[in-house]
């Protein structure tokens, strides 16, 4: 579907320079002299490179519609992650580097959304929050009120986050998977 350059919004996926790009940030600019344009920060969906582009209102770009399917995480097999389509029960195998650092958050039966373009997976979205147990937490230093009131802790999947001082080892906490931050106790 063709759209004008000034209609690009954050989250839109467009075809540009032979690749698929997602708009991360957009800024409509109206200079005193010359025509208005849309300054867009793009991120390549395949290799993650970033690009800043200007699109005039008169330019048209191809907006791509991605198919989004729900999959359930089954298991890990070496460097491969195995998912199952919840509608057709077909299995999908993705490499760990496709998911990136967030692969550590995958748990058996976890529902994820896989973005497909022409039946080929190009992106994956994990739940925004997961519940995990704390395996290690530093003891609280009494009277340390001038500094930040957070202490380092290690989750059951090996990821280090900062937690409030009242969180102890063995407790379950809710973690933001995008920012890798503590949200609350479970």
From Swiss-Prot:
Keywords: Cytoplasm, Elongation factor, Protein biosynthesis. InterPro entries: Elong-fact-P_C (IPR015365), NA-bd_OB-fold (IPR012340), Rib_uL2_dom2 (IPR014722), Transl_elong_fac_P/YeiP (IPR020599), Transl_elong_KOW-like (IPR013185), Transl_elong_P/YeiP_cen (IPR001059), Transl_elong_P/YeiP_CS (IPR013852), Transl_elongation_fac_P (IPR011768). SMART domains: EFP, Elong-fact-P_C. GO terms for biological process: peptide biosynthetic process. The keyword Hydrolase does not apply. GO terms for molecular function: translation elongation factor activity. Pathway: Protein biosynthesis; polypeptide chain elongation. GO terms for cellular component: cytoplasm. Transmembrane segments: none annotated. It is found in: Cytoplasm. Belongs to the elongation factor P family. PANTHER family: ELONGATION FACTOR P, TRANSLATION ELONGATION FACTOR KOW-LIKE DOMAIN-CONTAINING PROTEIN. Involved in peptide bond synthesis. Stimulates efficient translation and peptide-bond synthesis on native or reconstituted 70S ribosomes in vitro. Probably functions indirectly by altering the affinity of the ribosome for aminoacyl-tRNA, thus increasing their reactivity as acceptors for peptidyl transferase. This is Elongation factor P. The gene is efp.
